[in-house]
Amino acid sequence: MKQKILGITIAFIILLLTTVAILFSVKVKQYLNVNLWTTQQQNFLMFKNEKDENLFNNVSWTNFQAETTEKSAKKAFRLYKKKISTSEISSELNKNLVKVDLSVTLEQGWYNITIMLPSKDLFEVIF
């Protein structure tokens, strides 16, 4: 009888620990998605097709936010800034890229973003 009670107790403890671990991992994942700008959170623009999205992803981001509502969000947003040199920006401007200024409001705060797009057509598709 003692072994049966001991076995049930051990099984209950294991089940409880497993539940806590699952809940913890879900909370951590939600935190990463909302607060630390995982890749999924970057996709705030819609594309008609994969080709347009690939074109957009190959373009440099030249100037990230001017202001945000939270300092932690500002740091997290900067993690995804692609660092490019001034000469690279100039060479891109020489390729007749279209400069687009956006004001974007996201969960993390408010941002001014300047992006360079490969063509006016892509600009019309995105916005």
UniProtKB/Swiss-Prot annotation:
Cellular compartments annotated: Membrane
Keyword Membrane: yes
Record's bilayer topology term: Single-pass membrane protein
Transmembrane segments: 5-25
Keywords, comma-separated and alphabetical: Membrane, Transmembrane, Transmembrane helix
Main location: membrane
Keyword Transmembrane helix in record: yes
GO cellular component terms, A-Z: membrane
Organism whose genome encodes this protein: Mycoplasma genitalium (strain ATCC 33530 / DSM 19775 / NCTC 10195 / G37)
Protein name: Uncharacterized protein MG389
